[in-house]
Amino acid sequence: TYNVYSDGSKKKVNEYTHNEVDAKNFNAKTSDMLPEAIENMSIYQNEVNDVVKYTNEFRTEAGKEPLKLDETLTKAAMVRAIEMAYSNKFSHERPDGNMCYYIMRDFGQDIYGVGENIASRQRNAKEVSYAWKGSQGHYENMISSSFTRIGIGVIKFYGTYYWVQLFQY
């Protein structure tokens, strides 16, 4: 940004930088993202615990048993959050074209009996949890009696949060 004066001179007063991510060629595998996912489990530990807390409060209100936080599901959810952020593909479909639940194969688990909620832009666990509660399909996943375990993924990338809940029987 410049101040331009009547004599034609100008003075630079601010420099604007624009960061844009080129995600067209994103092709990372789960194994590529796993070290960051594991690190993010520590970085976002409070957010993970808070989403689980809100989810279990909603389940209690609905007369359901609480979900148990599962380490493998959390790793998988963290990878899902990372791949959505880095690929700029906010979808239940993974960047490789497979559906979201196929991530479980990368962790040696069955793809059946898996549910996923995704969200972006909410700034904290309370916001995202209540956004999911306010959406019928997401809320149904949260309170489903079929699910017994949960994993949470979150990443803040260029100022935007990406959130993932993975549920499993």
Predicted regions and their residues:
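Mature extracellular or exoplasmic CAP/SCP-family domains and secreted bioactive peptides
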Residues: 129-131
